Amino acid sequence: MPEEGVEKFYHRDILSFEEISRVLRITRELGINKFRFTGGEPLLRKGVFDFFEALPSGDYNITTALAIEGLDIDRINRLKFAALNISCDSLKPDKYRYITRCGDLSVFLSNLKRVRVDNLKINVVVIKDFNEDEIVDFIDFAGEHRATVRFIEKMDFAAGEPEFSSLTEIKKQLVENGIINPESFRINNSVSEYHSLIKGDGNVGFITPITRHFCQDCSKIRLKANGELKLCVFAGDNYNLRDILRSEPDDDVVKKWLHDIIQFKPFEPVIKKNLETMAEIGG
C-alpha cells in the first residue's frame, strides 16, 4: 500500500450490496459457483456482515488482514464460509507496521487467536530482502493455529516496486533442510502447489505467478469495488460492468454481456509493466 493511500471513490462509484448480489445470481447462471471477497479489507465496509449472512448457500470465502481492532470475530466464526484466507507478510512488529503502513501486530494476533473456522489459510507474499528470513517461522506459526500457510510470489506490476523473490529457490531449501517433502500436489484444482510437511500433518502451499505461471489452469475473474471487471490480474484491460448493471434491468442482457466478455480471458502470460498495483486492484 502506498504511504499516501490509493484513490478514494465516492459511495455512488462503488457497487452496492444489491448490485453485488445481482452479479452473484447472474454469474451462477453462467456456471460460476465459487466466490471470494477480498480487498483492501472487505470487513471494513459498513453492513458487510449483514450482506454475508443474507447470501444464499454457496462456496464463499473471505480474504482479510484481521487487523481491525474490535473486529467481531464471533460473527466471522458463524458465517460458515468455505474458507477464511488471512493475509500477513511479517511476524515481526516493526516489519508488520511497515508493510501495513499502520498495523499493530498484537491486534492481528489477538484476533487470530479467537478465529474458529475449519479451513484457515495464511497467505504470505514473499518480498526480496524483507521477509525471506521468516519462511520457517510462518510454517511453524501456521501449525500452531491449525492453518495452512501459502507463500506467494510478489507480482511486480508497477515500476519501482520491490523485486519478487523466487519461490523455486525457497522450496529447494525447504526440501534440502528436511522441512517439506519434494513431491508436490494440488487440491481441488487450486493454483497452489502443495508440499506436505515431513514432521506433522500440515501442508505448505506455493503460488508462483511469475516463475511458474498457471495461466492455462486459471479460471478466475476479478470484479473491483467500482464495478470494473478484470479477466486477468496481469492484463491492462478492464470492462465496466457497473454501468451495464445500472442501465440494463434485464438480467439476460447482462448475462450475455458477461458471457461475451469472459471469452476474452487470456490463458497465457500477458505480464505488463506500469499497470495498476495490487493495492488498486485488490486481492
Each model region followed by its residue ranges:
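Canonical Radical SAM [4Fe-4S] cluster-binding loop centered on the CxxxCxxC motif
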Residues: 1-15, 30, 232-233
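Accessory C-terminal segments flanking Radical SAM cores
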Residues: 157-173, 179-270
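Canonical radical SAM enzyme core domain
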Residues: 7-22, 42-83, 87-107, 124-137
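A short, N-terminal amphipathic alpha-helix
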Residues: 20-31, 114
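Short flanking/linker segments adjacent to small metal-binding domains or redox-active Cys/His motifs
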Residues: 34, 41, 261-283
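Generic structural signal for hydrophobic
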Residues: 27, 55, 76-79, 112-115, ...
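Structural preference for beta-strand elements that scaffold enzyme active sites
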Residues: 34-36, 59-63, 83-85, 119-121, ...
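Radical SAM enzyme [4Fe-4S]-AdoMet core and its adjacent flexible, acidic
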Residues: 94-113, 118-205, 209
